[in-house]
């Protein structure tokens, strides 16, 4: 028996699947969303775009936009008493409503 793989997409089968109605690429508006520094955002991974995708442990977490890195945003998230800095494309973010 070989050793079990624990890669980046480990245990993400349901998390990275879409319903038939949601299948396909996202709209251009979703790809080009804009956020301001200081905005609260929720990490909501878009499975059809792997580029700029955060790890699944951050799915559903709320963070604050701290700046830009090219097309992506620098997002700070509190996790386990520490602040994590993520570089995430806007297609994987949505505004926090709370």
Swiss-Prot record:
GO terms for biological process: translation. GO terms for molecular function: structural constituent of ribosome. NCBIfam families: PRK04306.1 (NF003303). Signal peptide: none annotated. It comes from Korarchaeum cryptofilum (strain OPF8). Belongs to the eukaryotic ribosomal protein eL21 family. GO terms for cellular component: cytosolic large ribosomal subunit. The lineage of its organism: Archaea, Thermoproteota, Candidatus Korarchaeia, Candidatus Korarchaeales, Candidatus Korarchaeaceae. Pfam families: Ribosomal_L21e. This is Large ribosomal subunit protein eL21. The gene is rpl21e.
